[in-house]
Amino acid sequence: MHTESAEPVGFPFTAIEGQPQLQMALLLAAIDPLLGGVLVEGPRGTAKSTSARALAALLPAGRFVNLPLGATEEQLVGSIDLEAALQRSAVQFRAGLLAQAHQGILYVDEVNLLADGLVDLLLDVSASGINRVERDGVSHQHDARITLIGTMNPEEGQLRPQLLDRFGLFVRLENVPSTAMRKAIVKTRMAFDADPRGFFAAHANAQAALAARVAAARGVLVAIQWPDAVHDQVAQLCQDAGVEGVRADLVMLRAARAHAALQGREQVTFVDVQAVAELALAHRRTQGAPQSQEGDEPSPESGGAQTSQPSGQRADQRADQSTDAQQAPPSPQPANAQTWGEMSAPQAVPIQTVKALRPFSSKKA
């Protein structure tokens, strides 16, 4: 558990192959740390941790702090020397991992296995940029503008929906889709392993240019505005996705603003919104809500498209069908019909003659 400085022999961010969505999400979070971090879901070997470490080299401080699963709350937020505070009336604060990660990357591998309380605390700090520590009436706070990156393998469990929604952006990685891409990734990695310094030097110009773009975007971020028409588009996308609350709207607008800043634009455009929409909606879209145009395919379970109707019409149709069913005579079923689970039609049962019963004798035995 320690802070790691970005070394020049680290794998360069600009050399990562086959993960454009992941790279974009990480850059947006680096430009605006208050987005709420990035959650990356995917199988092993899909460049999750490599990308997170490489991002740190693009930031001015270059800090990369790893949060182990066994960390305690005190190790994360820091601690207050209560005795010193009482005796000398001065707060003596011992910095935790959040303070160490200020202006850098705080990375949590297998965040789905981290205690819910720590995840909740991390997300609070990531969204506010401030770490508050309280102990027995003594409090201390400090800036903690961290770029939070959490990764998880879905085979090892899921995050609770309440925590999932609080991550600003979400990227779902798949296995390498083609043999050509596999070859490109392997060749790149082998070239780096053979000569890390030489490989990094070959990408130094691209790295410097991207770092300059990120720094410039961070500098102009707050000056970039979005027109009402863009805000209308964001609201409609979130409404169509059936998301709960307005967190998705806020994240999408902030992410679109960061994207515009990275592209050198002075205001947010529809292009910026489209570039970030799925990153903000993928983990918030409710079941049954329409996907984006590319993903509008019926699921195998649905059996095809279904047409929704107003509830009043459905109720009237059910009533009509019920009346028709009562009036229509039962139709004969073929012998080979699949009628498992159906209830047979009610049959009239004649009243049987009941033999009269002799009353009990009132005399006592």
Task: Tell what function each PLM region has.
Residues H2-Q23, A241-G242:
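Dynamic helix-loop-helix/coil hinge segments at AAA+ ATPase domain boundaries and subdomain interfaces
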Residues T72-E73, A99-S126, L159-L164, M181-R182:
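Conserved AAA+/SF3 P-loop NTPase catalytic/coupling segment centered on the Walker-B
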